[in-house]
Structure formats: C-alpha cells, structure tokens
C-alpha cells in the first residue's frame, strides 16, 4: 500500500475527488471506465463486500491506523492520499464524512431481466432525481425485503456520492438496473418488460380508482412491482394507466401524501412477500 502525503489537490490522480462532476465520474461514453465515490469505512466495506474495485483513498492521516485500518487491509494495491483534517477541509471545502473517501470502479450494469427472474417483490422508481431520496429508498428496500430496485432512465444515479452515503451502502446490497437507455423507453417500454417478466404493477398514487394498501388482492400476487413517482408530482398519468393496480396509503389528520422514501417504506413493508 502506497501512502502519499498531499498539500494540494491539483494533481490529476485526485480529480475524482475534487474536479470531476457526477456525470464525468459516471462516464456514459465509456462505462467500463466509470468511477463512483464511497464515503466512510462502513460504506466502503460494504462496497468491497459486493466486489467493487477500489482505485484510491483520500483520508485524514489519523484514519490510517484508526477506523479505516480494516478496509485498507483489504486493499493492499490501492494508493492512499492523506493529510490532516484541517488541510483536507481547506483543500476540498468540506469536512470528509468520517474522514475517508474511496474512488471505486463502477460495477458492470445488469438488465432488469437478469435481476428479476426469481424476484417476487421489486421497487420501480420513476423520475426520482433527489439523491437523498434515492439513497433512502434503497435503504428501505434493503431493510424491508425488496428483491431488486428498477429505475426509469430519468432517475438519479444510485451511485452518485450522496445517494451512496444516504443508503449506508445498501445500493451495493440490493440489485438494481435501469429500465431503458433513454426517457423515451418509459413508461411504455419499461412497463411492457415488467409485464413480460410476470409482474403485476402497483402504482402508488392518489386516484379515484385507488385501492387501499391493505387490499387482500395485492397480497395474493406472486410477483408484484411497487411503482413510486417523483417527489413533487408523483407518477405521470400514462404510467398509472399502464399499471394493474393504483394503490393509496390511508392517512389521518388531513395529510394526503408522504415523502417518496417514507411512502416507499410503508409500501415495502405492507406489500412484502409473506
């Protein structure tokens, strides 16, 4: 393991941490060269457990023989760039989460069909662009038994830095895939693929034809896809029209909606396979 003391972040090797945008890190033109950033020893360890390849670390000096020692022992070939906390804060402009960042190679993408052959309960996300919500949804999906998460092409990347952090690494534990290559593939193309895989689809939406989330018919479905929409407007009408069910969560005190991550958690628990 090579440890390099730094005094500035202008060297090209540190560009993933300091200069590259999320889009540049993802590298859509050459996805095999894509990178993501994992933060904190716990999240980095979860990514390593999932087989992700570490490229380098940026961390406070005290982390090397402290909380990061365990993950560093698993990455003997990775370069570690280090400095004191005060230096890193000045250079990066923010405090590192738990003092450790790791640049890692993006895993090879999978198709929905590869992931969902034996799945019984999956989450399908439409147009969710808030990375905090993406991370929270993945954490709920992992905790509450979803077999996979599928995303419309307009969703935020689950491997963007904040989504990875908020998910507490569960983006590496729950299989996920994007339903199509462009927004034009959703909803018609994506819904057709879900139905071809044998899923009944349940749109979480306020609608006159909506059934309650505790409707017995939902629990009898062998393969059910729970479809969640954007933070503001929810699912588009065309998506709802393509779904087999429209489902609502009964609420009290005049509340008519929940944050999408909270609504997802309720739906995942109530509609889990039993």
Regions found by a protein language model. Give the residues of each.
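Structured adenosyl-cofactor binding patch, chiefly the S-adenosyl-L-methionine
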Residues: 102, 140-144, 158-172, 237-274
């Amino acid at each position: 393991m090579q440890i390099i003391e730094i005094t500035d972040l202008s060297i090209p090797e540190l560009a993933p941490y300091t200069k590259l945008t999320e889009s540049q890190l993802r590298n859509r033109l050459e996805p095999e060269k894509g990178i993501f950033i994992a933060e904190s020893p716990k999240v980095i360890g979860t990514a390593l457990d999932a087989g992700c390849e570490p490229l380098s670390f940026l961390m406070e000096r005290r982390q090397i023989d402290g909380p990061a020692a365990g993950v560093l022992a698993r990455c003997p070939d990775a370069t570690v760039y280090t400095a004191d906390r005060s230096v890193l804060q000045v250079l990066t402009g923010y405090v590192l989460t738990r003092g450790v960042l790791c640049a890692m190679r993006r895993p090879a993408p999978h198709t929905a069909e590869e992931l969902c052959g034996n799945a019984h309960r999956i989450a399908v996300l439409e147009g969710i662009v808030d990375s905090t919500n993406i991370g929270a949804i993945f954490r709920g999906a992992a905790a509450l038994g979803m077999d996979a998460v599928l995303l419309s092409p307009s969703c935020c990347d689950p491997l963007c830095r904040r989504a990875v952090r908020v998910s507490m690494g569960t983006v590496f534990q729950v299989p996920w895939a994007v339903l199509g290559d462009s927004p034009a593939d959703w909803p018609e193309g994506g819904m057709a693929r879900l139905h071809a895989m044998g899923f009944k689809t349940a749109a979480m939406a306020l609608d006159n034809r909506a059934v309650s989330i505790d409707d017995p018919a939902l629990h009898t479905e062998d393969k059910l896809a729970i479809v969640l929409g954007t933070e503001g407007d929810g699912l588009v009408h065309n998506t709802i029209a393509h779904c087999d069910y429209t489902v609502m969560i009964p609420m009290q005190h005049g509340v008519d909606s929940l944050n999408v991550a909270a609504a997802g958690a309720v739906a995942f628990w109530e509609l889990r396979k039993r």
